[in-house]
C-alpha cells in the first residue's frame, strides 16, 4: 500500500499550490470538481439543497464551493503539522456528522479533486500514489 509520508505530503502540498492557483482560476477549479462529483453521484445534489446543489452556477453554490476548497486548502497546508491538522479535521468532522455524508461520497470527492489537480498540472507530473493516501488522511479524519 502507498503511504502519506513526509515526501508525499510535500509533493501534495506543492502540486495543490500549483493547481489551486488564485482568483478566477480557483472558481473554475471548484466548478470542475463539483461538476465531476455530481456527474458521478447525481443523488449527492440532494445533500446540498441549502446551497443550491441543483445549480452549481448560483452564487450560493459558488460560495459553498469556495468554502470547501478553502477548508481543503487549509488541511493540505497542515499535512506536515499533524497535531494542528488533527484539530482542524475534528472541527470538520463535527460539521459533517449531521449531514449524512457516507464513505462513498468522500471517495467521489477525492476522485474529483485528484482529477481537478491532474487536469491543471498535467498527467505527466501528477502523482496519484502520493495523492490517494494523503487525501485519505484528510477524509478519514473528517469521517471521524
Curated annotation (Swiss-Prot):
Predominant cellular place of this UniProt entry's protein = secreted
Single GO MF descriptor: oxygen binding
Query: Out of the domains of life, which is the source?
Result: Eukaryota
Pfam families per record: Globin
| UniProt keyword terms in alphabetical order | Heme, Iron, Metal-binding, Oxygen transport, Secreted, Transport
Kindly list the GO CC terms recorded for this protein.
extracellular region; hemoglobin complex
Subcellular localization(s) per the UniProt record = Secreted, Extracellular space
Globin domain: residues covered: 3-144
**RNA-binding recorded as keyword:** no
Record-linked SUPFAM superfamilies: Globin-like
Identify the residues that bind heme b: 96
Per UniProt, subunit arrangement is:
Part of giant hemoglobin C1, V1 and V2. This worm has three different extracellular Hbs: two dissolved in the vascular blood, V1 (CA. 3,500 kDa) and V2 (CA. 400 kDa), and one in the coelomic fluid, C1 (CA. 400 kDa). V1 consists of four heme-containing, globin chains (B-E) and four linker chains (L1-L4). V2 consists of six globin chains (A-F) and C1 consists of five globin chains (A-E).
UniProt lists the family membership as follows: Belongs to the globin family.
Protein's UniProt name:
Giant hemoglobins B chain
Q: Whose protein is this, by species? A: Riftia pachyptila (Vent tube worm)
